[in-house]
Structure formats: C-alpha cells, structure tokens
Amino acid sequence: MTQTNGFDALHAHAQRLRGAAIPALLAAEPERPTQYAWQVGPLYFNFARQKYDRAALDALFAIARERDLAGAFQRLFRGEQVNVTEQRAALHTALRGDLTDAPVASEAYATAAEVRQRMGALIQQLEATDVTDIVSVGIGGSDLGPRLVADALRPVSGARLRVHFVSNVDGAAMQRTLATLDPARTAGILISKTFGTQETLLNGSILHAWLGGSERLYAVSANPERAAKAFDIAPGRVLPMWDWVGGRYSLWSAVGFPIALAIGFERFEQLLEGAAQFDAHALNTPLEENVAVLHGLTAVWNRNLLGSATHAVMTYDQRLALLPAYLQQLVMESLGKRVKLDGSTVDSDTVSVWWGGAGTDVQHSFFQALHQGTSVVPADFIGTVHNDDPYAENHVALMANVLAQTEALANGQDSSDPHRSYPGGRPSTVILLDALTPQALGALISMYEHSVYVQSVMWGINAFDQFGVELGKQLASQLLPALKGESADVADPVTRELLSKLRG
C-alpha cells in the first residue's frame, strides 16, 4: 500500500490528524454526527468519532480506487480465483444469494440451495424423533460461527432441541457436556472440512462410543466419503461443504446445521437473507457510500497511519457475547499475513490484534487501560435499539453506557490531579442493530466479512488461506508418539526438556 501513488498524501493527512482532538474535528465539521452516519437495512453505523476528516477520507478512497477495490468485489462475487495460493474461488456470498450473472456463482448458489433443502428434511426427521439434545463437534470455523449464531438467536424458552457445542480436544470439555445428557435422547453432528482434524476426530470417537454407534450421528464435510467411512455414518446423514468456502466463512452452508436445529430452519434462512441484503450493499454501492468499505478503510487508517496495534469489540447485548471470539478468527486468520499475493514481503503492517468482550462487564475489567493507558485502542461498540426482554430499564442503562463510554473515550476530561485526568482521543465506531433478529445478525456478520476483504485488498494479501496454522499441527502430530512413551527423534532441546517433565 505504501507504494501507491496516493500514499504520500495520505501520510501527510495522518501527520496532520494524529494529535487532533476529536471534539475539534466535530467542531470543524458541524454536520459530522450525521454525515458520518449510515443506515443500511437493520444496521446503523456512526463513524463520527474516528480520527479522520473529509480530506483524509478522500485520500483513503483514492488509494482504494488505485487498488481497484470495486473490481476486487466483482471478482469475489463472480467466483474468480481470489484465493490465489490455493487456486480457489471464495464463494461464501453464493451460499446466501445470487447477485451476479456469473455462471460459476449461479451454479454455486443453486448447489447450496439444494443442500439446504436436504438439511431442512433432516431437521424435520430429527424433530419427529424423541431426541432432545444435539452435540455439535467441530473446531475453528466449524464451531465459532455456529456457536455464535445459535447462542445469539436461540429461544429463551420452549426450544424443541437444545444444541451443545464441543470444540477443544481437552477431554474435560466433552466430559462436562455429556455428563448432563441422556445418550438415548441425544444426536451428534461432526463438522470438519477435511475430516482429518485431530480435535474433531478424537471428540467424534468419544461421542460415537457414548452414543453406542452411528445411528444418531450426522456429519458435514467437504470430504463426505471420508466422513461416512470414519464413523460408519449413513451417506444420507452426511451433508457436503465445498473447497470454495473457507471454514471461517462457512456458517451459511451446511456447517450451519446446528444453527438451524437451535433456532429453526425458517430463522436460519432469514439469517442468510440478511447477509444477502448486505452483500448487495457491499457489491453495488459506490465506495464513498459503502459501509463495508468505510469500515475496512477505517481499520487500515488506524493500523497503518495512526499506528494502533490492537482493536477492541464491545457488544452491549449479552446475546452477542461470543461475537468478539468469532471476529478474532475471521479477522486474524484472514489478515494475519506477512507476504503479498505475489509472494513478496508486505510493505506495511497488516492485521491488528482483535479482542473484546460484553458490556458492561468489560467496563470493570479492561476499560481502565482504554481510558488511561498508554496505547490508543480503536473500538467498535455494538448495541441494539430495541430489545425484546421484559426488563426495559436494564436496556436503557445498557445503552446509556454505550453513549457514555464512547463520549468519554473520545473527549476525555482534564483534571488538576493527573491521576484523574482522561486524555481522550480514543476513536470508536458505534454500530446499532434495530433489534437482534436473524436478518440483522446476518447483515452484521456479512459487513465484517466484507470489511476484512477490503483490508486484504488494500494490503495486497490473501484473506482466504491460513497456512500459518499448519506448522504447529504438524509438530503436534510428530510429538504424539513421544508423549505416549514411544521412541521419537526430538531435535529441539527445550521440547525435549518439556517432554521429560510431562512423561514424569
């Protein structure tokens, strides 16, 4: 990005604005509170407290045009091989809508719709049995997305099926889950793209034995033959996924099977509808009015021009408490790259460390550092305008905290006592859902997906591979024999010492 024609001008704006007070920016642009705000379907965004002005934004958009961001969106949606290192398309958008005339994308959409029909039929069959509980086994993209959506949208009471998620290879996770269930009234779903994932295979074996066989086991995989063979699951209970959908983008596919079981098939389809509606905004809206583009460019601005190394996400709705963990994978696995598409080293920093939690709990843990620490941490504050629980006063208090915290972070407060002085200048974006509906959550997740893609295009990196996770898995596989007491050649001296401690 630093090699673009417009970077010097952008850098000059950053130098001008780095020390600017956010109240001064608001005073210089009196219409900023509304001009930097957008309503897209059920989502409202306000960027007025970010540390840029119109001139800096124009410079950002100029680089986005130089990077052919609009063309990059076309290539993504049309099913071109944007995942160049694996020579694959990234057609997660086709799982929820058909927005182009590209045959590849249209075929993917039709295939996904057919699999959803099969999934709906399996759900009807399950609901007609005496099964009351589902154990969903997966990890990473096979777990974080489904777990987030199921937790956010599950009924408060009266659910026909209860879904439990197990991801960690630590046996305690499976033990605690199964201890509360009756094997005669439980079914299991094993989700793995390759069906070679160690955690899923080990936990799947435990679940298979506990259930007494495969009669109530289902699977989702891009390798359905291996899935069926590994646990003797009938082919009719194995749903496919595809190599043109990355795990962290897959909740819209049959990986969403546990979502549909937890919230109902109709509401699962509404989730997809909401995502498709935001997809249309991302694909068809001019850059300057495109919220996904602005969100992504804001992240680039804060990372590369203002030097922020981390980004916080605070969800002021308890039902979205798992969103920060989901976004950690979506953002950091997608953007944690140090080489560009052509294999050369990047010329700027890439991904920030994403983290966060649920408000107001986090105000009593890490907000001290946000307000008075030495690091400036940009943040997203996410809340809901309307809440459907019966405790209206609580929701008012919750939203009062969103307003108060974002104002305090931005404006600060002087004091004669330095210990009680707040420097301010902490930028934030406020995102409000009209209500936490399937459509709104689908749109919100879609927005973050496209924001990630924007950042990858600006940095010239591949958002759709994850080779960084492989080395550790390979070494773990090689060390298993040594931990079991078998002879093994372990070259690393620290690993040898740790092995001796673990083996007693």
Swiss-Prot record:
Disulfide pattern: none
Primary localization: cytoplasm
Presence of keyword Cytoplasm: yes
Subcellular location: Cytoplasm
Top-rank lineage group of the source organism: Bacteria
Active site: 333 (proton donor), 364, 473
Matches recorded under CDD domains: SIS_PGI_1, SIS_PGI_2
Keyword Cytoplasm: yes
Record EC number: 5.3.1.9
Pathway: Carbohydrate biosynthesis; gluconeogenesis; Carbohydrate degradation; glycolysis; D-glyceraldehyde 3-phosphate and glycerone phosphate from D-glucose: step 2/4
GO MF: carbohydrate derivative binding; glucose-6-phosphate isomerase activity; monosaccharide binding
InterPro entries: G6P_Isomerase (IPR001672), G6P_Isomerase_C (IPR023096), Phosphoglucose_isomerase_CS (IPR018189), SIS_dom_sf (IPR046348), SIS_PGI_1 (IPR035476), SIS_PGI_2 (IPR035482)
Record-level GO cellular component terms: cytosol
Keyword terms, alphabetized: Cytoplasm, Gluconeogenesis, Glycolysis, Isomerase
Reactions it catalyzes: alpha-D-glucose 6-phosphate = beta-D-fructose 6-phosphate
Any GO BP annotation: glucose 6-phosphate metabolic process
Family the UniProt entry places it in: Belongs to the GPI family.
Entry function: Catalyzes the reversible isomerization of glucose-6-phosphate to fructose-6-phosphate.
Annotated protein name in UniProt: Glucose-6-phosphate isomerase
Designated gene of the protein: pgi
